[in-house]
């Protein structure tokens, strides 16, 4: 059994989970707990990073498989959280917080999809430079 891929995922996952916890705590301290801003922030930021690094590391530099496992499966997999989003949405549904529920669902989904796209655009801009602006 090859240990390197499992170790890459484990280390990335540990760092991603700790980062998610820190970002969530910072978001709660900044904006309070009336809305799951921490979950929204990690999901949208993680989506941006996934799009960015998909272009930079996979498309441009052909990163090693163990590094891709570390970053995408490990770090970003643990940093972003669909399960917290689902649980928080269920809580809002059960409490009858309809506006918060719909906002949470819409902003997490549209925001995350938009951010992965924006991440790819930013990566392409960074890699290609601003050639057209001369």
UniProtKB/Swiss-Prot annotation:
Catalytic reaction annotation: fluoride(in) = fluoride(out)
Cellular localization per UniProt: Cell inner membrane
A GO cellular component entry from the record: plasma membrane
Keywords: Cell inner membrane, Cell membrane, Ion channel, Ion transport, Membrane, Metal-binding, Sodium, Transmembrane, Transmembrane helix, Transport
Regulation: Na(+) is not transported, but it plays an essential structural role and its presence is essential for fluoride channel function.
InterPro entries (UniProt xref): FluC (IPR003691)
GO BP of this protein: cellular detoxification of fluoride
Residue spans crossing the bilayer: 7-27, 38-58, 69-89, 110-130
Flavoprotein found in the keyword field: no
Binding site for Na(+): 77, 80
Membrane topology: Multi-pass membrane protein
Highest taxon, organism lineage: Bacteria
One Pfam family in the UniProt entry: CRCB
Single GO MF annotation: metal ion binding
Reported function: Fluoride-specific ion channel. Important for reducing fluoride concentration in the cell, thus reducing its toxicity.
Name the record gives this protein: Fluoride-specific ion channel FluC
UniProt lineage: Bacteria, Pseudomonadati, Pseudomonadota, Gammaproteobacteria, Legionellales
């Amino acid at each position: 059994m090859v240990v390197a891929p499992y170790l890459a995922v484990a280390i990335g996952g540990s760092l991603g989970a700790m980062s998610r916890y820190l970002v969530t705590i910072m978001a709660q301290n900044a904006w309070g707990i009336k809305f799951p801003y921490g979950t929204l922030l990690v999901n949208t930021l993680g989506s941006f990073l996934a799009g960015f690094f998909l272009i930079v590391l996979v498309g441009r530099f052909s990163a090693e498989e163990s590094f891709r496992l570390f970053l995408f499966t490990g770090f970003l997999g643990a940093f972003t959280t669909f399960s917290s989003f689902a649980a928080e949405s269920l809580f809002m549904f059960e409490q009858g917080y309809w506006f918060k529920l719909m906002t949470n669902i819409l902003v997490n989904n549209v925001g995350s999809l938009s951010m992965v796209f924006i991440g790819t655009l930013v990566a392409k801009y960074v890699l290609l430079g601003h050639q057209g602006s001369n």
